[in-house]
Curated annotation (Swiss-Prot):
Subcellular location: Cytoplasm
Protein name according to UniProt: Holo-[acyl-carrier-protein] synthase
Family (UniProt): Belongs to the P-Pant transferase superfamily. AcpS family.
Disulfide bonds: none
MF-aspect GO terms: holo-[acyl-carrier-protein] synthase activity; magnesium ion binding
Underlying gene: acpS
Keywords of this entry: Cytoplasm, Fatty acid biosynthesis, Fatty acid metabolism, Lipid biosynthesis, Lipid metabolism, Magnesium, Metal-binding, Transferase
Function: Transfers the 4'-phosphopantetheine moiety from coenzyme A to a Ser of acyl-carrier-protein.
Species lineage: Bacteria, Bacillati, Actinomycetota, Actinomycetes, Micrococcales
Length: 118
């Protein structure tokens, strides 16, 4: 059963300028494992984090490091949740988080579907 859906888009050029103008932003938004990725990958991950927050219904108490995107052996993205976000997902009975990210034509986008078992 679908429990939530979220989508977000990020302008790559604007996001890149923001990271260049405010170097601390990279540290604030991304975990240590994510920070070394290229700007287009960071923008897609930021869009995915925003989409997950929308799917959960809000960002109260959420810290950006509570949401991390990792890739499996086949480079499929998946979330690692911590702290407040992990508790929110457990309280809502979220069994699966599906995430899709892409970037093209100067835009990064992400789509998240939250699923309960029944």
């Amino acid at each position: 059963m679908i429990a939530g859906i979220g989508v977000d888009v990020v302008d790559l050029a604007r996001f890149g300028r923001s990271l260049a103008r405010t170097p601390a932003l990279r540290d604030r938004l991304f975990t240590e494992a994510e920070r070394g990725l290229p700007v287009h990958s960071l923008a897609a991950r930021f869009a995915a984090k925003e989409a997950l927050i929308k799917a959960l219904g809000g960002s109260e108490g959420v810290r950006w490091h509570d949401l991390e995107i990792v890739s499996d052996e086949e480079r499929n993205p998946a979330f690692v949740l911590r702290n407040v976000v992990e508790r929110q997902a457990l309280e809502r009975g979220i069994a699966h988080i599906h995430v899709s990210m892409s970037h093209d034509a100067g835009i990064a986008t992400a789509f998240v579907v939250l699923e309960r078992d029944s």
